From Swiss-Prot:
It catalyses: beta-D-fructose 1,6-bisphosphate + H2O = beta-D-fructose 6-phosphate + phosphate. This is Fructose-1,6-bisphosphatase class 1. Binds 2 magnesium ions per subunit. Pathway: Carbohydrate biosynthesis; gluconeogenesis. It comes from Acinetobacter baylyi (strain ATCC 33305 / BD413 / ADP1). Transmembrane segments: none annotated.
């Protein structure tokens, strides 16, 4: 693997990757470097613990949630090619620049409940084409198939970015010495079959019958119709769980459950499900709600929630068929 920097990689890409889009991606990456630095400081900079507020999702915000959100908004709202941006942490979208070509949506710090115990967290982003010279909320209501780029940054033992611009998936590793993201894997592909699954099993009593059936079969292992044993993994950070799947295949599930029937699912379509679905599909996997392809959903709200079943194609197809 050549030691291409993220900037060099973007310069070499064709297709729908315009120079303007490359600049937006680099701006997101630079903001994530700041987030990474803040996470590394942690308690030394008094950045652990709650900020004392709730976000639009009704979740208690961590100090690093707020700081990460500010880093991204401050950089993107003044970017000449960003017409508007939307954050999981804020109720309304933030206007960008008139005639900006792109809209950016992001979850600034996924898995923030892991912060105080020094476990993995991440940033997720999605980029859509802008529809008008002056952005309105309705301009964000685009299906996931309209995404021109998506990715995440995982803040783990090493800091890594996964990126797709619609032509496969690449991994970049952050080099703290040069302060650059370096291409370390290209053409990431999932196996169609797997023996690993990720789900929060504490919600089992609330699941629909198709999901209960599927998980029961996995847990029965060799003694079931599956004829093989499975291992369960759960990090409580979607970025970390999806990164594992991109590295060694698997299936991730946050299905519809009856714990709160007013919610169609737990994960946010625009900030989590769509960008992760784009990555997984570009790596040869599948992503559905259990009933429909996630990227075909027409959004009706910036903070719309959906069930998510995503990963190795044959497993996703099987559990979807049970619905």
């Amino acid at each position: 693997m050549s030691n291409l920097t993220l900037a060099q990689y973007l310069q070499q890409k064709n297709g729908n990757l315009t120079p303007e889009l490359a600049q937006v991606i680099e701006t997101i990456a630079n903001s994530c470097k700041k987030i990474d630095h803040a996470i590394q400081k942690g308690a030394l900079a008094d950045l652990l613990g709650s900020a004392g507020n709730e976000n639009v999702q009704g979740e208690t915000q961590k100090k690093l949630d707020v700081l990460s959100n500010d880093f991204l908004i401050d950089a993107l709202k003044v970017h000449p090619h960003v017409g508007g941006l939307a954050s999981e942490e804020l109720d309304e979208f933030t206007p960008g620049q008139q005639d900006g070509k792109y809209l950016v949506l992001f979850d600034p710090l996924d898995g923030s409940s892991n912060i105080d115990i020094n476990m993995c967290v991440g940033t997720i982003f999605s980029i859509l084409p802008a529809k008008n010279s002056i952005t309105q909320t309705q301009d964000f209501m685009q299906a996931g198939t309209e995404q021109v780029a998506a990715g995440y940054v995982l803040y783990g033992p090493s800091t890594m970015m996964a990126l797709t611009c619609g032509e496969g998936v690449a991994f970049f590793t952050f080099d703290p010495e040069s302060q650059t993201f370096i291409l370390t894997s290209d053409a990431i592909q999932l196996d169609a079959d797997t023996q690993e699954f990720a789900i929060n099993a504490s919600n089992q009593r609330h699941w629909e019958e198709p999901v209960k059936r599927y998980i029961d079969e996995l847990l029965a292992g060799k003694t079931s119709v599956r004829g093989k044993d499975f291992n369960m993994r759960w990090v409580a950070c979607m970025v970390a769980d999806i990164h594992r799947i991109l590295c060694r295949s698997g299936i991730f599930m946050y299905p519809y459950d009856l714990k709160d029937p007013s919610k169609a699912g737990r994960l946010r379509l625009m900030y989590e499900a769509n960008p992760m679905s784009f990555l997984i599909e570009q790596a040869g996997g599948s992503a559905t709600t259990g009933r429909v392809r996630i990227m075909d959903i027409q959004p009706n709200d910036l903070h719309q929630r959906v069930p998510v079943i995503i990963g190795s194609k044959n497993e996703v197809d099987l559990v979807t068929s049970y619905h």
